[in-house]
Curated annotation (Swiss-Prot):
Function field: The glycine cleavage system catalyzes the degradation of glycine.
UniProt superkingdom: Archaea
Subunit structure: The glycine cleavage system is composed of four proteins: P, T, L and H.
Cystine connections: none
Keywords assigned: Aminotransferase, Transferase
Protein family according to the UniProt entry: Belongs to the GcvT family.
Name the UniProt record assigns to this protein: Probable aminomethyltransferase
Any one Gene Ontology BP term: glycine decarboxylation via glycine cleavage system
Length: 398
């Protein structure tokens, strides 16, 4: 059955294109991908990202469990703040990229990918139920995806909008810090976070969902819809645009961010690791805390010794052409890899992409070729983000 977010009916009325994504019917664009993309880079946009997964861990042993099933050290951040961390399988391959919030009082909220939350929840509950070291833990694991509406407000004007709506300055919060706020009597969690490269915040509202898979929990999303429309109304003076998943993808790609299923993934069958991706290959070692034990650590240590074989690299087209997922990449006359994500940058009006290539080519400044429609087009490897960070993004100076 296709899944739907809380305010799907609003999107159905206002979006120009709705498509299935990771099992969800989601808005792809309202006006156009380019218009929405540029609104976020230059002003502010709002995304409904309620298809993202939420899993809650409660109990005295919640931290102990999470420390073992994720790669980063989530014991340090105080409540309420989050840690970017990875969940790996025993072979060191990435099951998902996640954000784990310490909510205080032995409770943790994990934000995970839209097409990974079900397998993660099943896996965590399997470990808790069957692995001896976990069976006696004081731990409750609850899937909350269908109960929480999640909206992302992104762009340089997001700071002003947060001040108007909530009376807070998000620039006084560190990245992934969160706090409880209210809007017109509706309580929600607000975090300084996002997936666009821009400044911004995300809100989490617990509410009824008319499309909840459990019919007994269905209801009208009055709180979520009110918050969504209120943000749009208050944001009019800043040029806010409702944005779909199309712009979200081009924005994350311009920022150089990885996407689960493209740059990070694991096989569903335990047969071979040819198509699996590890943090060392995906340039995500910053999310690994080596001074603890975690699932997949032994496999990663062995990979460090023997070499990773291939790595992710970002590239920008020199010749005219738009790279797409699956296109072959060449250097010095030999095939060295293939594109995992590619698009025409709405900001730069040039083709950009991410590719897996042989390890020796995974550094900036190397001329490569991308085979586009039967022709090899010149490109060069670069360091992300693709835009000038002094002019755009979280650390812009202008």
């Amino acid at each position: 059955m296709v899944k739907r977010v809380h305010i799907f009916d609003w999107h159905k009325e206002h979006a120009r294109k709705i498509e299935e994504f990771a099992g969800w019917e989601m808005p792809i664009w309202y006006s156009s991908i380019k218009e929405e993309h540029l609104a976020v880079r230059n002003a502010v946009g709002i995304f409904d990202v309620s298809h993202m997964g939420e899993i809650v861990f409660r109990g005295k042993d919640a931290l102990k469990f999470l420390q073992y099933v994720t790669t980063n050290d989530i014991s340090k951040p105080p409540a309420i703040s989050g840690t970017y961390t990875l969940v790996l399988n025993e072979r060191g391959a990435i099951k998902d990229e996640t954000l784990v919030f310490n909510m205080g009082n032995n409770e943790y909220l994990m934000i995970c990918d839209s097409d990974a939350f079900e397998k993660l929840y099943a896996w965590f509950t399997y470990l808790k139920r069957t692995i001896e070291q976990f069976t006696k833990l004081d731990l409750e694991i609850e899937l909350k995806t269908y109960d929480i509406a999640m909206f992302a407000v992104q762009g340089p004007k997001a700071r002003d909008l947060a001040k108007d709506l909530f009376g807070i300055d998000i620039n006084e919060m560190w990245w992934f810090q969160a706090r409880w706020v209210e809007l017109d009597g509706i309580k929600m969690l607000l975090s300084r976070s996002g997936y666009t490269g821009e400044n911004g915040f995300e809100v989490y509202i617990e509410d009824a969902n008319p499309y909840h898979p459990d019919e007994s929990k269905r209801g009208e999303p009055e709180k979520a819809l009110h918050v969504w429309e209120r943000i749009l109304e208050e944001g009019k003076k800043y040029g806010i645009k409702p944005c779909g998943l199309g712009a979200r993808d081009t924005l994350r790609l311009e920022a150089g961010y990885t996407l689960y299923g493209n740059e990070t993934k694991e096989l569903q069958l335990l047969s071979t690791d040819i198509d699996e991706v590890t943090p060392l290959q995906a340039n995500l070692e910053f999310a690994i805390y080596w001074d603890k034990d975690f699932i997949g650590k032994d496999a990663l240590l062995k990979q460090k010794e023997r070499g990773v074989g291939r790595k992710l690299v970002h590239f920008k087209m020199i010749d005219k052409g738009i790279p797409r997922e699956g296109y072959k990449v060449y250097a010095n006359g030999e095939m060295i890899g293939e594109v995992t994500s590619g698009t025409l940058s709405p900001l730069l009006n040039v083709g950009i992409g991410i590719a897996f290539v042989k390890e020796e080519y995974a550094k900036p400044g190397i001329e490569i070729e991308v085979e586009i429609r039967g022709q090899r087009k010149k490109a060069v490897t670069v360091t992300p983000p693709f835009y000038d960070p002094k002019k755009y993004g979280l650390f812009r100076e202008t």
